[in-house]
Amino acid sequence: REVVREAIMLDRSETGVRLRCRSRTPFPDKVRLRAPRLGLDIMARTVWQTGFDTGLAFEM
């Protein structure tokens, strides 16, 4: 089952991203990150969550 969450990408590097969501609902361990305008469609793992912010590491 796919769940879609909108978020603001606060920071991006070669290895991952920092996102800010509207809710504090925990992310699953693994997610598919899609941002078509940025050319991103990649699997990532949740590394940390604090409040509304989440850090994801790209699966290389």
Regions found by a protein language model. Name each.
Residues 1-60:
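Structured alpha-helical
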